[in-house]
Design a protein with these regions (language model features):
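Conserved C-terminal portion of the radical SAM core fold
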Residues: 1-25, 35-64, 71, 76, ...
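Short acidic, glycine/proline-rich loop/turn micro-motifs
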Residues: 25-29, 91
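Alpha-helix N-cap and loop-to-helix initiation/capping positions
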Residues: 30-38, 104
Length: 219
């Protein structure tokens, strides 16, 4: 509140890392290391304090912990992460002292997406706001009022559909396509729904990089 009042800025996303095992790091060496219970409370308090802000959690947390914080308000998670230098270019060896932290959730991206679909979540790969310059006060005014959801829902479905067509396993693709059909009904703006369906069909025909960018009506 002070930052907004004094500087006109506020949090766009908040990350919730904590000390976790890594090369040469033993969490037992830290007397004030945060337990799972306290960690979950911190996530819940942040979500209540800033309900409009994206919250991020990485693969340093276990699958069980990530499942819990998704229920408490985390909105962005990673999957299939590589934490060492060049990790995405080359397979990581068993002993790699360049790792930033030990990955606790070792599932592949496809497995994470499949898991999210099973939980009824929409795995979104959207970056439309950044690419359209919908940032700063322009973004915050929409996020605080919840109006940003009118762009998020179509864009989430579009980016998910592109992922499903290009990278997903057959099981994940089947679940994802079914979820897209269901979630289309939650787009209440007829024009937005029509545009989303048009773009979804174009993606299935092999076209790429669609995003819904129309500014939201304040009515």
């Amino acid at each position: 509140e002070h930052l907004e009042a004094a500087q006109g800025v506020g949090p766009h996303t908040i990350s919730v890392p904590r000390i976790c095992p890594a090369d040469d790091i033993d969490t037992d060496d830290f007397s004030n290391a945060i337990s799972d219970e306290i960690f979950h409370k911190i996530v819940a308090v942040i979500r209540i304090a800033v309900p409009y802000t994206g919250m991020i959690i990485s693969t340093r947390e276990s699958q069980k912990s990530r499942e819990k914080v998704l229920e408490l308000g985390v909105s962005q998670i990673s999957g299939g992460s590589k934490t060492s230098v060049g990790g995405y270019a080359e397979p990581e060896p068993e002993e790699d002292n360049s790792a930033q932290f030990d990955v606790s959730d070792t599932r592949t991206l496809d497995q994470v997406v499949n898991w999210l679909l099973d939980g009824g979540f929409i795995p979104s790969f959207c970056t439309a706001c950044y690419r359209e310059g919908r940032t700063g006060d322009r973004f915050m005014s929409l996020a605080k009022t919840g109006q940003i959801a009118n762009c998020c829902q179509p864009n989430a479905l579009l980016t998910l559909n592109e992922y499903l067509d290009d990278y997903a396993s057959e099981d994940t693709r089947k679940k994802g396509k079914a979820l897209i059909e269901r979630e289309l009904e939650n787009i209440t703006n007829p024009k937005a729904k029509e545009t989303c369906i048009k773009y979804l069909n174009a993606i299935d025909e092999g076209k790429r990089d669609f995003r819904y960018v129309k500014e939201i009506s304040r009515e």
